[in-house]
Amino acid sequence: MKDILIIAGPTAVGKTDISIKIAQKMNGEIISADSMQIYKYMDIGSAKVTKEEMKGIKHHLIDVVDPSEEFSVASFKKMAQNAIDDITSRKKYPIIVGGTGLYINSLICNYDFTGAYKDEAYRESLQAIAKDKGKEYLHEKLKNIDIDSYKKLYPNDLKRVIRALEVYKITGKTISELNSNVDLYDIPYNIHYFILNMDRQKLYERINLRVDIMLRNGLVDEVIKLRDMGYNSNMQSMKGIGYKEILSYLEGCITLEEAVELIKKGSRHYAKRQLTWFRKDERAVWINKDIYKNDDDIVFKILSSIEEI
């Protein structure tokens, strides 16, 4: 059974620096589990790790999808599994790093992403309803038949809301019911799972500062370039935090100051949702960064914990 290390946590908590230091000590390579860093050309708004920051550590699943393409959890799982096989075949250690909980869970939980249940016509009808009556209407519709999915998903998660409705229409069962007979932790990996966290107010301050740095580093110009390349707000990639707000500014819907505040607010709310998601997995070891002097102490703690297992 292959060993994999997972370093997760909310946005701006400092996963990148710590994971690279760990990779250097473990002869490891990093697999990004980030739903925005997967896209090409979207560097500043996704806080994508730079070549200099990588410090010679090979990174996988960064800059592999064109922003015009839809990218699913199933696609991530397949690509990440291939990367794990590649890394281990070269006697190196796979390190999964990111904050997209569903991406991480696709690897460390026994989820079915085969897409066996499909009804294209019904799916298209739901998309038409969403366009006519709004995303919130479909989200409320989900409440009556799949309360678990309703609580997990937000109205803006339209693709997954429609998927939950589609599965119920075909099978008469919710996604949770279909997975209830499956051993959730029956996976082909031996996992070492660590979640970085810190005082909430400190985290929010780091998030606000990161957004300010993104603006100084040219976020507006990056979005202008993407728009000029033909990418628009209807695309999955351009609905990411930081991109949709700047697009609204460029379209004259809001001021730049309003866009910046929306990015900060959206990022803080996203961090809160990430923490809620990660708390669901009892296998994870939480690392409170506030009690350590520096990142090197955290790296030592994680490496020591792995050796003890």
Swiss-Prot record:
GO terms for biological process: tRNA modification. It comes from the Bacteria. InterPro entries: Dimethylallyltransferase, IPT, P-loop_NTPase. Its EC number is 2.5.1.75. Residues 34-37 are annotated as: Interaction with substrate tRNA. Pfam families: IPPT. Gene3D superfamilies: 1.10.20.140, P-loop containing nucleotide triphosphate hydrolases. The record marks 100, 123 as: Interaction with substrate tRNA. It catalyses: adenosine(37) in tRNA + dimethylallyl diphosphate = N(6)-dimethylallyladenosine(37) in tRNA + diphosphate. Keywords: ATP-binding, Magnesium, Nucleotide-binding, Transferase, tRNA processing. GO terms for molecular function: ATP binding; tRNA dimethylallyltransferase activity. Substrate binds at residues 11-16. It is an enzyme of class 2 (transferase). The keyword Cell membrane does not apply. Its cofactor is Mg(2+). The keyword Nucleotide-binding applies. ATP binds at residues 9-16. Monomer. Catalyzes the transfer of a dimethylallyl group onto the adenine at position 37 in tRNAs that read codons beginning with uridine, leading to the formation of N6-(dimethylallyl)adenosine (i(6)A). Belongs to the IPP transferase family. This is tRNA dimethylallyltransferase. It comes from Clostridium acetobutylicum (strain ATCC 824 / DSM 792 / JCM 1419 / IAM 19013 / LMG 5710 / NBRC 13948 / NRRL B-527 / VKM B-1787 / 2291 / W). The lineage of its organism: Bacteria, Bacillati, Bacillota, Clostridia, Eubacteriales.
